[in-house]
Amino acid sequence: MQVPEHVVSLYIATCGQNGSGLGSDEKEIILLVFVLLEVSTGQIVGTKQILVRPDGYFIKDRTISSSSDNSSVTNNTASSPPLAIGDANNGSGSTSGNGNSLENGSELILPIAEAQAAGKPLSEAIEEFDAYLRSLSLHDTEIKLVTDGQLPLRQCLHREASAKDVELPAYYNRFSDLRKEFLRYKSGDLARALVPVKDVKKMLQAPTLPMPQSIAEMLGELNISSVEDNDFYIRESRDMVTVIQTLLQAGHKFAANELVNLVLEPGICSIDDEVDGNCIVRARGLPWQSSDQDIAKFFRGLNVAKGGVALCLSPLGRRNGEALIRFVCQEHRDMALKRHKHHIGTRYIEVYRASGEDFLAIAGGASNEAQAFLSKGAQVIIRMRGLPYDATAKQVLDFFTTGDTPPCHVLDGNEGVLFVKKPDGRATGDAFVLFANETDAPKALGRHRESIGQRYIELFRSTTAEVQQVLNRSMDPKNYESGGGHSQPPLIAQLPTMQLPLLPQVGAHSLSHSLGASPANLCPPVPPPALPLPTQHLITSGTTKNCIRLRGLPYEAMVEHILHFLDDFAKHIIYQGVHMVINAQGQPSGEAFIQMDLEESARLCAQRRHNHYMMFGKKYRYIEVFQCSGDDMNMVLNGGLASPVAQPPPPHLGHAHKQQSLLAATTGMFSSAGQSPTTVAAGTAQSPLGGTHTHTHPHSHAHAHATGHAHAAAAAAHHGLSASSAMLPGLSAAASASGLASFMSAGQQSAAAAAHSAASLQNAAVALAPQGYALNPFSLPPPGSAAAAAASTPALLAQQQAQFIAQQSLLVRQQAAAAALAAEQQQQQQQQQQLYASAMLQQHPLYLQQQQQQQQLYASAMLQQGQPQFVLMQRPSAAYLPPFPLSYMSAAGAASGVGVAPGAAVAGAAAAASPSASNSSLSQSMKRSYENAFQQEAAGAAAAASAAKRALTRQPSSVYSYYNSGI
């Protein structure tokens, strides 16, 4: 190898740490010292000392974070402060004692003030020395830089030049490390010594010489004293020249080259390769749009191995801001760790150690197709996303060569396009494309969001490691199986079961006794069972294929667009039957599930709307429509996990169970007939009061609600009526005349008993609630395990809050409805009679004695004329359903914020926890009122009662609802 005729001693100083911490604190260069020496004689040809003015680039709009590997700090930690200019003494290499210099170590004094005053920008300083070399007719190949270790060039000059977009001449990309050259010089002396043959083995077993750590240590080993030269700002730079001169005069040749790679070369990593774990680091906090070139630029000056940047992907295939970087040796890995909390723009990047197994798990590939694709020697890899599933390689080639933007040709034509497919051969909509030159990258990326057919295509710069990672995931059958421990995570996050200690449960047997008994009977002494919340809303279940799945929706599509796309089939969608799927990041996934009223409707919709186009703005996208079952839908949404199954109803539920099934079928949310009234009411209460809108739940699944006010009011009225009627004593047809007075006063007795019972429940709940929390539904804390899990994940906290509030909203609505009824009983006797006249009071024989004959005659006349009869039914007003905030409340705020009537707790608990009481009240009131009011035959009465039940779920138009028995 040809040895240059001249060497250049390069000394670099920053305004921060120097020595072993040089460049680790991300401070700027303030001094460059160039000394040109002749190799043959060791004489100094010329000297250039250039002060560089720091411009504060590394502290603009951000706070500098110190490195985790810094061993010491300087006395003045300010980065290039605007210091006052004092009289500098260039002869001594220091400034006057006015605080304008930076002492770094025991002897090093940096000319901060002079650099601020007379320094040049870094680009001008580099150009000045390059012009000096040209004036001496010296070319790149005729000189070699010599530095004190690796840090001056790798950690300082190349890093800062890359950040400031300063182009360095080619001779800065190769240099000699003086410390390594000195060690080689000392080892060479031992090798040339005259050693007897018998002692050669001992010499080979001798320990290797340690690497010198400073210029002073080299001077000590050479027995040379420091030279007093007043022409140098820093004495250490002159001592470095002395060491180089000594080696040159001793005949040492600076033949070794330390290279700086400026281009990240692509490479292929097989899963069977052996990777040195001492060469791997993990970078966190990267911008999501960062490419491998951006990461290589962050580590500029350090040599990254071929294909050594592996971008980590999330389970959904998107970049998550992390990357694994593989360097050529441990020395470069150690320097990379010193860039911990250095910056890319305004973001600081964390750098940690990693293992070889971590790198192979991301970058290692086992696909022969990927190996052949990546071995073509392309400099640029572009990832395409959003392709039509039937796209061909010719369409991809035409995409990059046609249009208004400059054409860019794909390497090797069709062979330069690789489509990503699933194990069954179906396309995923992704592809990778190769380009030969780096100049093709901006041309290709300039076609971002242009269209192929009716689909716009997203383009990203990719890496060989990302190609391997994507193909490994796409070809792994475990990612598409319904079971197994390695199945892909669910689109809807699964929450741990959350135990919420609500109010003590009131048994059905307590309500069967007379209200004249002690109120303590309403509060059983045993602690209430914890109420487990389902980990996932049960949307639907079963193998009946009455659902459809839409795929390929625009990310901006709303429920209105889906209804318009389905056209006439939209009328077959059940209530709350449109489910927009949202990914773990809270963004639309482009899919939706829709529940239809019949299996035949779903089949026809999938047959006639499949691959039809949806117009969105000025673009058209074809939508795939598939028929599926409720189990299929839950399997996809839960990531292959079995959907939660509703518990079967108690066997003693009769008419009340039929009523709740009727409500469940109307809402469309709970198709299983085995859900409790509490669950049905909770699902109904979740509907916001208002018109058509989209409600996005915190658990990453959005329900499209078409209506909400009518069903929420109907459910509240149903449960309020059941609770109120359960508190009244039973009636018999053989009651005496004195029973009327006692019956009329039953309202006051029930209200008083409810107030007394509420106090007992209050005391019991206080005893069960944790200390320090007020007794209020909104102040009850979640359990410790759930709170600890939610504290680390904001999304989990939001989901738990939503579940907690959904349960509390049901309880609050029931309590509010019962409280309003109790207040009306106490305030106005006339309103009490009006509320219960149609349900129970009209059944009393004494009360109906004067009007029964007139009603029978009127009913007979109306039946003979063929006119329908009407039953007057009341519903609670909107005041019974007060809105409540969807958030947690503090303990103090909860104690004083929401006030509940004394009887509300008992009424709410009775409505929620006493299905048998609801059954009894309905059988005594509603069923009997239907039979007596219509006075028809058995078949006619059954038809009329069925029509009245259907009308329960219809939206009332005013305060009173009139149900036509003939509908």
Swiss-Prot record:
One of its GO terms (biological process) is mRNA processing. Disruption phenotype: Death during embryogenesis; without displaying dorsal-ventral patterning defects. Heterozygous embryos act as a dominant maternal enhancer of dorsalizing mutation cact(E10) and display a partially dorsalized phenotype. Keywords: mRNA processing, mRNA splicing, Nucleus, Repeat, RNA-binding. It is found in: Nucleus. Its main location: nucleus. The keyword Nucleus applies. It comes from the Eukaryota. One of its GO terms (molecular function) is mRNA binding. PROSITE patterns: RRM. One of its GO terms (cellular component) is ribonucleoprotein complex. Residues 694-708 have a biased composition (Basic residues). Residues 65-80, 89-100 have a biased composition (Low complexity). mRNA splicing factor that regulates alternative splicing od specific genes. Has a maternal role in embryonic dorsal-ventral patterning; such role is probably indirect and due to its function as mRNA splicing factor regulator. Belongs to the ESRP family. This is RNA-binding protein fusilli. It comes from Drosophila melanogaster (Fruit fly). The gene is fus.
